[in-house]
Amino acid sequence: MRIAKNIIITIAIIFSLIYALNLEYFVKGVRVVYLNGYTTVYIDDYKYFDNEIINTSNPKDWILHTNYNNYKEDPSFEEFNSEMETSAFLIIENDSLLVEKYYDGYDDSSMTNSFSISKTILSLILGKAIEDGFIKSLDQKVIEFIPELKGKFAKDVRIIDLAQMSSGLKWNESTLNPFSVIAKTYFVDDLNKLILDQPFEKTPGKKFDYSSGNTQFLSIVIERATGKKIAEYFSENFWQKMNAQNDALWQLDSYESGNVKAFCCFISTAKDISRIGKLYLNNGDWNGTRLINSSFIENSIKAKVSDIYGIGTWLTNYKGLDIAMMRGHLGQYVIIIPEKKLIITRTGKKYMDNGAIEITEDSFIYIDEALRILDN
């Protein structure tokens, strides 16, 4: 009886501390991640969160390339995919599906978390909000939409500063620390309350500093400007018009708060997320219908404060080819090579993490394989 009483008291103390220290998010993280055998968030974790449905309309499949799946496999590449636990690898040339391969039990109907590819999607939504007149320009001040903005430089931050990751926001993007702000953003039940408490402490527009907080602030701007939820606005202006084969999901902090995790967590099939690549490759045109101004797309894939980042897109030059890339945690990629009219999509559970924010080596391995197949 005494032992049982002590156990109850200990549990009561633990839970009291959890609530007193606002660590409910930490408990949720342990339950979702560690108790499922993972050490970080993963591509199937959306099943443990509330999600907003992104409705499609008039779904259509990709046109198949005349050489669809007609290629000789490279054993070393297949071994690499096994090592990286790839779930899907697609190559699209001239808007036609050339290569489609799935691994580890995944198939063309499997939905997975694209993580920070969502940042590119939100950039599209931003461009549309500007085009529709809800936002004057990229140079408009953020404080006009969020008067409660905090920090020494709150009055100086422009929308472009958020979009190009140069806002001066106080932020720690490290996913290794379970008590960091980025860990909290993934598991808290009121994300925007947390975000709005983060201050802008450095001069904006001067230095590239990749931050999920920038994207979440941007989503608040867009929702206040348009009067619509991010998911609804994206569905109406893009997902339905791109004839996605499936409804998608966008992870929420909770149904009660209703805030999409704009910095991450757009969930779809590999073939459907590739449609974002097609829209960029064709400068905002979708099969003859313009979904967004071409000038915004062109501006998005030009280097800004950093030579590796535009507006929601990563940039590099490889083997003489200019490349724009959408990237997400654990190696989610939609890679665009305009000169080759090429889109490469890869989803999976691992990547070659070098601890840096720059483009990682594994993405070039997927590019090399696509170029090899095209040349043969």
Model regions: which residues?
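Active-site SXXK
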Residues: 95, 113-138, 162, 218-222, ...
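A short acidic/small-residue loop/turn micro-motif
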Residues: 103-107, 111, 350-352
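Flexible glycine/proline-enriched surface loops and loop-helix/loop-strand junctions
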Residues: 107, 177, 199-204, 214-216, ...
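Active-site helix/loop module of the DD-peptidase/beta-lactamase fold
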Residues: 132-170, 197-199, 224-263, 268
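Active-site Gly/Thr loop motif
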Residues: 245-246, 251, 297-345, 353
